[in-house]
């Protein structure tokens, strides 16, 4: 039994002046509280170091609850998030705060028919006026008519421009705490969305297309830029971390950077070094949201040698994010900003150059003199 023993569970009564670090380190002793503790400590001790590139995926209705302003923006300011994948809905509802609109605590058991008649929108226990949607839509359509948007672009550039305009509104209105989009713009953190048409932002882009807008959001740009970020993360002694809030398409878009590198582009890559997920999704239904780090190893998304550095905490992200944010803000000094948005073209060109060079090599290595035949990425071909 001795080899399985961890830290002894020695409970002591809580004090009236307990800190969040003390709470997590000493009272989150088992089950998913222990997983949250392990995730917090892994972030503080290993992930949030200068040589690690941290990608965060965001799904679920997190920004309507204010977490874009209260948690994600501070993490960006401290250099703890280098790039992001988000649902479009999270970025859309984040804009409400930047534009000075109001959202309120409500009740999940309100009469939704009456709410519709009153012009009130409900997101579980959050409520706000229908006019918030209309005014946000009007703002989006107005700025998307500007010249910088009249071209083909990826979603990182698109969100950077959105954040720029939202930040100007924040300044004019005197908004005290910037929203996620505006903060990412200021700190050079690229934000991608894996499904740009699947939100009110994309719906407004589509409406303007009917009017002749030249804006085209190109998913190929996003796939290659995100792969380039992951590819560059391993330069020198660097490492790559995937921190996943929820699951869904953003989770896959963050993790698929590795198969894009080795499976599709034929470049050598071993997977992300760190994997931390907060989710309420089960693994046994086969969906990506609940897929475990061990399963991701089979796809080449996670380095098998780094499985001990992977943690899944089964909990609501609205519980985990504020706790973990408070923990790392207390435990970790700010990191230098990577400003990966400003380096997109440089990283893209490096990936493209290496890919084209690899393409000139034989499609697969033929085994001779006892050698093992391999695929272009170096994976052995099993007979």
From Swiss-Prot:
Pfam families per UniProt: DS
InterPro entries: Deoxyhypusine_synthase (IPR002773), Deoxyhypusine_synthase-like (IPR023496), Deoxyhypusine_synthase_sf (IPR036982), DHS-like_NAD/FAD-binding_dom (IPR029035)
Keyword rRNA processing: no
Cellular component per GO, a single term: cytoplasm
Protein EC: 2.5.-.-
Taxonomy, superkingdom: Bacteria
Recorded GO MF terms: deoxyhypusine synthase activity
Keywords carried by this UniProt record: Transferase
Family: Belongs to the deoxyhypusine synthase family.
NCBIfam families linked: PRK00770.1 (NF001980)
Protein name: Deoxyhypusine synthase-like protein
The species this protein was found in: Nostoc sp. (strain PCC 7120 / SAG 25.82 / UTEX 2576)
